[in-house]
Amino acid sequence: MRFLALVAAPAKADDESMTNETAARGRDPIALSDALASFDALWSPRIVTRVNDYDVRVAKVEGEYLWHVHENTDEFFLVVEGEVDIALRDEAGERTVTLPRGSVFTVPRGTEHKPIARGRASILLFEPTGTLTVGDRHEEIPDYVDATTGHALA
């Protein structure tokens, strides 16, 4: 199995004028560790930057998400910290993939899936801008899940 190493350079601490907007346009680097340290909410992704028509989001996760499906788009996961399982349901049946730190996985469009983090973990997601975190179809949304298209970094 091949793993993707992710190393983020720290943002310039002396540049108080840096905003999410300028960072999102590629003017300044964004340290993923700083982005993740800027919020505490679980299952509530923050938009780190945009690439063409895609959001690059980070989220802190723990426990179970909910079964959901994105009918028209794949969903890319990269585990930044911790370990995440993704339960999958499709025509072939049900299975679970385990993603240790540094692993990537793409859930194909139309595949029901449910991320699960048995301990605290952090993930990075690539999704088309405006994609709802709970997909197009989903089970009942628990109170701890933020149904959103992503929040701006603080």
Protein language model regions, located:
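Ligand-binding loop in jelly-roll beta-barrel domains
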Residues: 109-139
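A cytosolic small-molecule/anion-sensing beta-strand core signal
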Residues: 52, 80-81, 100-101, 119
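Short histidine-centered beta-strand/loop micro-motifs
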Residues: 47-48, 59, 66-71, 87-89, ...
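A short, N-terminal "cap"/entry segment at the start of jelly-roll beta-barrel domains
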Residues: 2-7, 14-57, 140-154
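Short secondary-structure boundary/capping segments within folded domains
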Residues: 38, 47-51, 67-70, 76-78
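Short, conserved beta-strand element in jelly-roll/cupin
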Residues: 60-61, 70-86, 90, 126
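Short acidic-glycine-tyrosine-enriched beta hairpin
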Residues: 91-109
